[in-house]
Amino acid sequence: MSISSDEVNFLVYRYLQESGFSHSAFTFGIESHISQSNINGALVPPAALISIIQKGLQYVEAEVSINEDGTLFDGRPIESLSLIDAVMPDVVQTRQQAYRDKLAQQQQAAAAAAAAAAAAAATSANNQQPPAKNGESTANGEENGGHALANNHTDMMEVDGDVEIPPSKAVVLRGHESEVFICAWNPVSDLLASGSGDSTARIWNLSENSTSGSTQLVLRHCIREGGQDVPSNKDVTSLDWNSEGTLLATGSYDGFARIWTKDGNLASTLGQHKGPIFALKWNKKGNFILSAGVDKTTIIWDAHTGEAKQQFPFHSAPALDVDWQSNNTFASCSTDMCIHVCKLGQDRPIKTFQGHTNEVNAIKWDPTGNLLASCSDDMTLKIWSMKHDTCVHDLQAHNKEIYTIKWSPTGPGTNNPNANLMLASASFDSTVRLWDVDRGICIHTLTKHQEPVYSVAFSPDGRYLASGSFDKCVHIWNTQTGALVHSYRGTGGIFEVCWNAAGDKVGASASDGSVCVLDLRK
C-alpha cells in the first residue's frame, strides 16, 4: 500500500470543488501546491474521496460483522455504521459486545413470551372472533391512512408542474470527463462553449441546421514538456467569446491563457502569469484580452500578437475578477479586499476602492460604465462611482457570502433603453435578489433554491433571469414580478447559466460533467 500526501491533498481539493466550497478549494490548492502536482485530474473520477471513504467504511463494517474464520458474527448480517462511528477506537470489540448483550436480552424476552403465550392459549380459544373480510377497514384505520397520506411529503421545495421544463425541451450534452465550471454562448450563433476540470474546453453546435445534432469540438489544453505537447491536466477556469463571435479565449489553472478559433483551432498561447488564471475578458473592440491570476497581477494582452501589453502588479493577494469599463480601462478585485481601476499606459491605479471587510468575489460595470458593483464574502453588495472615494450604496440583505452579480441589459446605453436598470446578486444563502440601484432597495427576493447559488444571467431583453444552484436546479424568473416561470432539475450541481443571443435557450454547466441546454420556445 502506498499513500502520498500529494494524492490525499488532491482528493481533498477535488472534494471541496465538487461540494461547492470554491473558496476553501482555492485556499487549500494554493497552500498544498496542487498546481505543481503531476496527478492527471482528468483520470480521477468525480466523488473519488467519498468513494474511497465508503470502501474503508465497508471494511470496518465487515470487521464488526465477520469472525476471523470468515463466518458472520453470531449469524447476523453486516452492520451499518456511520463514518464517525467507524473511526472510534475499539469500535469492533464494542459493537460485538453490545450485540452479545442485546442477544441475551432477546433470548430472555423470547422465553418469557413463550410461557405467557402457552398460559393464554386455553382462554384465547374461547374468545376468538371471526376475522375481518377482505376489503373491510376500521374507522381508526381510515383515519391513520389519511394522516399518513397527508404527511407523505419531501423536504425538497415543491415546484409547480406548470413551470417544470419537460425532458423534451432539455438537451443534455455529455463528453466532459470532470466537472464543468463555466459555459458561454457565442454572441452571434448557437455555439455553446464550456470549460472543465478535465483540462478541455468544448464548443457545442446547437444550431437548427447542425447536420448531426449537437456536435462538439474538443479544445485540449496542452503544455510543452520535453519538446512535445502533453495535456496540462489542469482545470479550465474561465472563457469568453469576442464580440464578433470569431474567437474564444480560455484561462486555465496551468497559468496560460489561450485564444481559439470558433472551429476549435489554437491561435495563440499567452504565457506570463506565474500561477492559475481565475478570470479573463475580451474588451468590446476585440483587440485586447484582460486576465487575472493567483500571482496577484492582471495583464492586458494584444489579441493579435499574443504579447502582453502591460502587467498590473497592484494587488497584495490573488486577483479574482476583472471587468472592462472601456476599451482600455478596467477594474479588478482580489482576496485583499481592494478594488483597483487601471488604465493601459498608467503605472498606478487611477482609482482604488476600499470598504469591503472580506475578499471581493466579483465586480461588474453597469451598461454605461458609470457605476461599478462589487460583491464579497462580507455578505454585502456595494456600488461605486469614479466620482466618489467611498461607495454610493452599501446593500446589506444577504446573510451569507455573495458569490456573483450581474447587471440587467436595460436602461440607458442598452438595446432596452425604456426598461429600468436592475442588479442581480447570487448568494450562498440560497437566494437571489433583484435590486433597484437608483433607490438602493431590494425589489425581489427569489427563494426557491435549496443550496448556494453560483450563477445568475439576464435574458437579452432583461425580462427574465436565469439562476443556477448546487441544488441541481435552473430556475427562470420574471424580473418584473419575481415569479418563477420555468424550472429544470439536472443531474449535477449547477456552476454557470447563460442565455443565447436570441434569448430562447439557456445553457447550464454542472458538477457531474454534463452541460444542459434548455429550449424556452413555446
UniProtKB/Swiss-Prot annotation:
Q: Where in the cell is it found?
A: Nucleus
Q: Name one GO biological process term.
A: chromatin organization
Q: Which family does it belong to?
A: Belongs to the WD repeat EBI family.
Question: Which protein, by its recorded name, is this?
Answer: F-box-like/WD repeat-containing protein TBL1XR1-B
Question: Where is this protein primarily located?
Answer: nucleus
Subunit-level organization: Interacts with heterodimers of rxra and thrb, and this interaction is abrogated by thyroid hormone binding to thrb. Interacts with ncor1.
Recorded source organism is Xenopus laevis
- CDD domains per record: WD40
Pfam families xrefs: LisH, WD40
What this chain does, per the record? F-box-like protein which acts as an integral component of the N-CoR transcriptional corepressor complex. Probably regulates transcription activation mediated by nuclear receptors. May mediate the recruitment of the 19S proteasome complex, leading to the subsequent proteasomal degradation of the N-CoR complex, thereby allowing cofactor exchange and transcription activation.
Q: Which residues form the F-box-like domain?
A: 41-86
* Residues in LisH domain copies: 4-36
Region listing for Disordered, in residue ranges: 122-150
Polar residues bias: where?
A: 123-141
Task: Enumerate the GO terms in the molecular function aspect.
Answer: transcription corepressor activity
- Cited Gene3D superfamilies: 1.20.960.30, YVTN repeat-like/Quinoprotein amine dehydrogenase
The keyword Membrane is assigned to this record: no
Q: Name one GO cellular component term.
A: histone deacetylase complex
> Keywords on this record?
Activator, Chromatin regulator, Nucleus, Repeat, Repressor, Transcription, Transcription regulation, Ubl conjugation pathway, WD repeat
Ranges for the WD repeats: 175-214, 231-270, 272-311, 314-352, 355-394, 397-445, 448-487, 489-522
Domain remark in the UniProt entry: The F-box-like domain is related to the F-box domain, and also functions to recruit ubiquitin E3 ligase complexes.
SMART domains noted in UniProt = LisH, WD40
